[in-house]
């Protein structure tokens, strides 16, 4: 199990605007509990999510999205993240009406609820697919569980937001804005499958700041392709981002 430590500011608002101030150190574990008894009792720091009527395991589609997101994070950071089935873990991911109407996650913390992710029950998260709202929600909430904050909000290590020119989903999955200058109170306006499929540039910078950068991923010559049917990007034939060096292609 990991423990939580404080994060220092970098004096770069592009990064500091995403840093909550907390991160994990040591081997990070995650799980998909299927019973309220999988959680500590009492659930310190939480809002009784495990014991609320309607508790359920995370939909399989969201579990797949989380696993995919963790694979991405492992590819460009030095974090060590291990799966622990349905058991106790640093990051426990499930569904509860307490999270309605959408979802939320707790920042890393040395208390029962620290790092846990909760999806609400008003949205059909079983519909999660690469590039849609539900899928990107998994990336967003896992980002919180690892120490990322909302890009449009101040607070965190330096009490700054991400600069407005980069506060949108083109640069970070932690933004409430579909495009630069969009309202944060009227919801996203992306097309159905026009949401980020990966962590974006500022997310990667912030995650690497907290957990170290792994430059071995895609460190050789790289060929980038794009599917005009699905919009998915491929690197050397694989739908995975983050060039670690080498020569780019087309």
Regions found by a protein language model. Give the residues of each.
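Zinc-dependent metalloendopeptidases
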Residues: 1-250
């Amino acid at each position: 199990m990991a423990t939580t430590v404080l994060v220092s500011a970098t004096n770069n608002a592009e990064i500091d605007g995403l840093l909550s101030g907390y991160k994990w150190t040591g081997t990070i574990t995650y799980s998909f509990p299927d019973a309220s008894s999988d959680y500590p009792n009492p659930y310190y720091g939480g809002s009784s999510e495990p014991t609320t009527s309607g508790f359920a395991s995370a939909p399989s589609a969201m579990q797949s999205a989380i696993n995919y997101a963790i694979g991405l994070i492992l590819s460009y950071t030095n974090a060590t993240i291990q799966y622990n089935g349905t058991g106790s873990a640093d990051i426990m991911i499930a569904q509860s009406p307490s999270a309605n109407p959408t979802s939320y996650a707790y920042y890393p913390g040395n208390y029962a609820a620290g790092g846990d992710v909760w999806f609400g029950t008003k949205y059909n998260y079983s519909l999660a697919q690469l590039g849609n709202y539900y899928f990107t929600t998994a990336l967003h909430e896992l980002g919180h569980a690892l120490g990322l904050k909302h890009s449009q909000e101040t607070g965190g290590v330096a009490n700054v937001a991400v600069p407005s020119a980069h506060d949108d989903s083109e640069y970070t999955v932690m933004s409430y804005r579909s495009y630069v200058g969009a309202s944060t109170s009227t919801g996203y306006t992306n097309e159905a499958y026009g949401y980020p499929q990966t962590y974006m540039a500022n997310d990667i910078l912030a995650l690497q700041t907290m957990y170290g950068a792994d430059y071995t991923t895609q460190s050789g010559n790289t060929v980038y392709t794009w599917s005009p049917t699905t919009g998915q990007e491929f690197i050397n034939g694989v739908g995975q981002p983050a060039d670690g060096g080498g020569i780019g292609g087309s």
